[in-house]
Structure formats: structure tokens, C-alpha cells
Design a protein with these regions (language model features):
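Intrinsically disordered, metal-sensing/regulatory segments
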Residues: 1-258
Length: 258
């Protein structure tokens, strides 16, 4: 049951964030959006290092001086996987006027939801692979450590849910539909987590590769999407400060609970 609740916590964060559309009349200011984006980037980067890459290297200690190899290979596989999805799936970031990926006749709002969904895929995989390690009895991964990752991602999912539902509302969509689209953008997380758990439990020796794969995928999102969004235009210092806050919070959660 711990794993079941653990994989639902991040989805709950997205849903609660999307519910902001019922309580906030206006879209978020640039300063607030940069702060939330920076915070999310900090949490994801810290989670990639403390919750994924370091355990991946620790689990490969039997390889001696080559213990870094599974982490490096998995990391690059995750980067390339997200790079491929970025080119295959048509999507549109909220602050961008130009769609990415192949040409499509999809509505602007649909492509905005796809952008956040693409972002959520590695987060679901990260939670799934950590809980797979815990369920398989890996000494480096504890129930508290897995919970710390779930909580950290849920905290940064809250503003992400708001960032998708509020702009949709601002573009004329009904509140209920904007909320539903915000929620649906996070559905991929528990689905990805469950699929990752099922796959990882059958290939336990590959767990270091899967941990670092999730880290690579998450860091791709941070560098390709979040850091540019928090660094463009005005209020860039706000994004940087909240990046540090998010990183520190996730680091504290992982060390204190792990």
C-alpha cells in the first residue's frame, strides 16, 4: 500500500494545482510564474541527483572503479529518449508562440496540455523506479526515501497544475474544462510509475540503469524547458532564487527522510 499511495501523491499535487482555476480570477503574473518554474526546476534537479543518480552509482559498487558506467549509460539513454519524444510529439509551451515537434492541426490548448504531459513522463518514471527499488529490497532505497521523492515532486506539481489550468482559462476555456485538462496532464505520472514498477521488478539487475534513465529524462526537461522559461525576460532573479529554494527543499527531504 505504501507504493500505491506513493505513486498517487504527485498526481494529487497536479490536481490540487489545477483546482486553482476555481479560486484565482486572473492568470499568474510573470514574476510568480518564473518563481514557480524556478522552484520546479530546483526540485527536479535535486531529485535527479540525490534520489536517482547517487543511488544508481551506489547500487553499482560491485563494479569498482567502473561503478559510474550504468549511471552514465542510463543517463544518456534518458536524455535521448526525451529528445526523441520532443521531436515526435507536437506541443506548445505556455510562454511560446511557436509549436515544437511535427506540424499538427491540433488546437493550441491541446498542444499546451501535451507540453506539460511530456514534462510529467520522466517524473512518473522516477517515482516508479524508486518504488521498484524499495519493493525489491534494495538497501540504498528506503520507504522514507521513496516518499521524500513523491512529496518533492508533488510539491512542484502543484504550481505546474496551476500553470496549465490558468492560461487555458485565460484563453476562454470553461473553468471545469481547464481544470480537467490540468488534471489529465498529470495522469501520465501514476501510469508511468506503475508501468515502470512492473518492468523494473522483472529486471532488478538493470535498476541502476533505470534510476539514471529517469534522472537523464528529468534533467532534459529542466535544461531544455524550465531553465530557459525562468531566465527569459524580466524577474529572472526571482526564478534563480526559487530554483535554489526548490533544490534545497528536495535535498533536505531526501537526506532527512532517506
Amino acid at each position: 500500500m505504501e507504493a500505491f499511495y506513493g505513486i498517487l501523491i504527485p498526481f494529487l499535487g497536479t490536481s490540487l494545482g489545477a483546482a486553482c482555476v476555481f479560486f484565482l480570477r486572473k492568470t499568474l503574473s510573470d514574476a510568480v510564474q518564473r518563481a514557480l518554474t524556478g522552484f520546479a526546476a530546483g526540485v527536479m534537479m535535486a531529485a535527479s541527483v540525490w534520489s536517482l543518480l547517487i543511488p544508481a552509482i551506489a547500487q553499482s559498487a560491485a563494479l569498482g572503479r567502473w561503478s559510474f558506467l550504468p549511471a552514465v549509460l542510463g543517463f544518456w539513454a534518458g536524455i535521448l529518449f526525451l529528445l526523441a519524444l520532443d521531436h515526435i510529439i507536437p506541443h506548445l509551451h505556455a510562454k511560446s508562440g511557436q509549436a515544437e515537434g511535427p506540424k499538427s492541426r491540433l488546437q493550441r490548448t491541446t498542444m499546451m496540455v501535451l507540453a506539460v504531459t511530456l514534462h510529467n513522463i520522466p517524473e512518473g518514471m522516477a517515482v516508479g523506479v524508486v518504488y521498484a527499488g524499495y519493493l525489491s529490497g534494495q538497501a540504498q532505497i528506503t520507504a522514507a526515501g521513496a516518499l521524500a521523492l513523491s512529496l518533492g515532486i508533488a510539491i512542484q506539481n502543484f504550481p505546474e497544475g496551476a500553470i496549465i489550468s490558468l492560461p487555458l482559462r485565460a484563453e476562454g476555456m470553461k473553468k471545469s474544462r481547464a481544470f480537467l485538462d490540468g488534471v489529465l496532464s498529470g495522469v501520465v505520472e501514476p501510469i508511468g510509475a506503475v508501468l515502470t514498477i512492473l518492468a523494473a521488478r522483472h529486471v532488478i539487475p538493470a535498476l541502476p540503469y533505470l534510476l539514471s534513465f529517469a534522472a537523464g529524462a528529468m534533467l532534459y526537461v529542466v535544461v531544455e524547458e524550465l531553465i530557459p522559461e525562468m531566465s527569459q525576460g524580466t524577474h529572472t532573479n526571482v526564478g534563480t532564487i526559487f530554483f535554489a529554494i526548490g533544490f534545497s527543499l528536495m535535498m533536505v527531504l531526501d537526506v532527512a527522510l532517506g
